[in-house]
Amino acid sequence: TLRSLGLKMGDRVVFNMPNILENIYYTLAAKRLGIIYTPVFGGFSAKTLSDRIHDAGAKVIVTTDSGYRNAEIIPFKNAYTDPALDDYIPLQAALSVLREIISEFDISETGESLFKKVATSLEGEITIERSDLTLALGAALSEESLLDAEVTARLRTHVAKRLAKISHSIKKVIVVRYTGQKTADYARDVSSHQLVDQSRKRMRKFLAIKTLDALNSLSEKDFWVAMNSFCRAKPVEANWPLFFIYTSGSTGKPKGLVHSHGGWLAGITHTMRVIFNATKSDRCYVIADPGWITGQSYLIAAPLSFGLTSIIAEGSPLYPQAGRFASIIERHKVTIFKAGATFLKAVMTDPASQGDVEMYDTSTLRVSTFCAEPVSPAVQKYGMESICQNYINSYWATEHGGMVFSCPWGGYKTLLADAKTWPLPWIQAEVRIATASDESGQVIEWRVAEEGEKGELVITNPYPYLARTIWGNTDQLFELNWCGDRGRFTEAYFTRWRGRYSYTQGDYARKGVDGGFTLHGRSDDVINVSGHRIGTEEIEGAILKDKTIHRDSPVGNVVVVGAPHQEKGEIPVAFILGVNGRKLNDDDIGRLKSLVRSEKGVTAVPSDFLTVSAFPETRSGKYMRRALRSILIDEDLGDLSTLRNPHIIREIQETINIWKALRDVTESAHIAKSWRYIRFE
């Protein structure tokens, strides 16, 4: 099917679908042909999808008419795919148009000034709405008094007309008809079902098989032989890019982490045996979306490569009632279970939800594991007592490719509810404390942390399934030594510590006397919301866009930090520096939330906006984010000697204390309302 559209080795495709079988079919098809794919989570906004399509240089996107989530229809094509392709255009293409048009007008120095102002105001974007550029141009023109009204009007008209002609690089949109919802039809759209039917007909003709029933009646071995003769797998070098998956960084645009055909697949398959002692008779249920690395690694690739059964379930594990995930375990006799801790936190804090779970038999489980976010001993204790006796804790991230810390099932340790996890046999790790840094932030002196001392977790040796690079430098993709954006990859993960090999993910940890590690969240400016990593700079950029859209915006500047949340782990909280001391009203807050939702998706929307008169600022002009976060979590503020304005700390503390008090009242009212109405329903 993919080959029939002219796709070949090295071409890129984007998958934006719910957790359905077609998502897996197309993933496996791309792997077979050496086509490089990038999965995009269905909860992201059209803007985020547009950015990733363009950054990937994709030719084809595969989507669905809709999906289901908590008894609601999620219109993938109408809400995400079509707006991503129609409403957004590549920034560089838009700037090229602007430069060309300016050169056609005899405005020389004024034109160059206009261009620089527009380019600066849109800096950091990958794709933009056409109105973003016209608004930026309008703002720049209002500052240039040398141009008369006629020239200004003609310039803006020419730009608007030319911008309308710019489009994305996508040639075809494959649409999977899943829910049957009506969608808009475009010339670029092709039906997945029609493409598959045509491929079946070509295959039957090639194999001289008259009917579809005859094709389906072939034995597994005969079908494999037939398929391999009809569509041979494309041989690729072991380090050829298999897929890249985007993750948020503390600064800059999201990073497309590249995983390879050889090392990644071999590594994650091996973890199934080492961690779970898996056999081909096991049934594995992973609560994950293919748009995240957990879905790629342990929902799809590792179980299928190992030869065991993977259970796929669309929607929330807690809907229509909290016992849904347990009912799936009972019904399908699941033996291996893997999920983040967020959903279990929601269950254990609600007696009614606990009762829902207890209705089902989960005794077939041999081993379960947490992933994606730090786990507390209390959550692990509940999991061990209520779900599976062997409920272990595993640690890894998108960059790691697969689990790097865990506790091999039935292995060398008596399992305790202490949230500890151990490096796998091929992982060498330590916790470090920085003692001296240079001006660039690189640690030039450090020591290994004492037992129980909190520091930064560092992996000190390479291993096969670690990400190879960051997606980039695509012009050299077919060169023998292609390394993607190697400079950015090295800068992001390998330059924190001076000296020997050191891979730094950006997480705090403690090492115990028994060699086990406990994880304590991020050490950089990334927020982990229910296992979804979001860069604070991404959220800040979306909020600051309000200044471009609304000339009367009250937003002067913004700093976003993560606040602890009982169920989600962390939630974004935005500190706003108001223009001329202005406060935000309800309309402002609603508008800013809507803006972040449309730009970055629902998980990025701050829970609250707190107005302050200034941010904690160092003498070098940098905002001290850690001070804001320390106040939020009632943590020791540490060394504040570098602050230029230490007096602002007390004001911010008072603001946060008022916010906490109001939040407690709101949560109490919400709980009472839930018990009065929702439980009754």
Give the ranges of each region predicted by the language model:
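Conserved AMP-binding/adenylation subdomain of ANL enzymes
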Residues: 34, 260-283, 287-335, 349-351, ...
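Structural core segment of the AMP-binding/adenylate-forming
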Residues: 4-5, 28, 32-215, 340-341
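Conserved pre-ATP/AMP-binding loop-to-beta segment of ANL
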Residues: 166-181, 187-246, 253, 263, ...
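Conserved ATP/PPi-binding loop(s) of AMP-dependent carboxylate-activating enzymes
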Residues: 437-495, 516, 532-535, 636-637
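ATP-dependent adenylate-forming carboxylate-activation enzymes
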Residues: 17-18, 38-54, 66-68, 72-75, ...
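Gly/Ser/Thr-rich phosphate-binding loop
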Residues: 190, 195, 203, 207-213, ...
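AMP-binding/adenylate-forming catalytic core of the ANL superfamily
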Residues: 15, 41-65, 330, 337, ...
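Conserved C-terminal "lid"/linker of ANL adenylate-forming enzymes
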Residues: 559-565, 572-577, 590-681
